Amino acid sequence: MSTETTKRAKRGVPEGLWKKCPGCNETIYTKTADELLGCCHECNHHFYVSGKERIRQVLDEGTFEEWDADLMPTDPLQFKDKKAYADRIVSEQQRTGLNDAAITGTGMIRARRVALGLTDSAFIMGSMGSVVGERLTRLIERATEQNLPLIIISGSGGGARMHEGILSLMQ
């Protein structure tokens, strides 16, 4: 147990009630940061917001229906750097609870149906591999076919995934 956790437990303060802003070092009530969509009220620093949390922020509660969750990354090149890509994918899936960096689907905003896609930087920095590209392509095609407004939110910072070579670059 960390010293901070021990101090918190001794004071009776629940874990996650407060967070420290890395932008200004202000201690912020987590609920306040959440109400500000992940921003610090003092300096406007933007905290990490997960893809699932972003869905909750954007769509009407309980309306999201995920598309193409069964698409899974493969390792066609059997790529290995410090770790085999196949092992990296499994560890990222276990760590994040995501199958890949993109989440796509449909939901409602003020009772209007929309198509929504987003990337989550927690999964290999939100980098684009073949699954990300395929999910976004299918999202765009379905939104067009169904005449739905399309919203894509990039939580990415990773670029194309080198582990998949040309397959990620073709996206």
Regions found by a protein language model. Name each.
Residues 1-171:
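Terminal-region recognition feature
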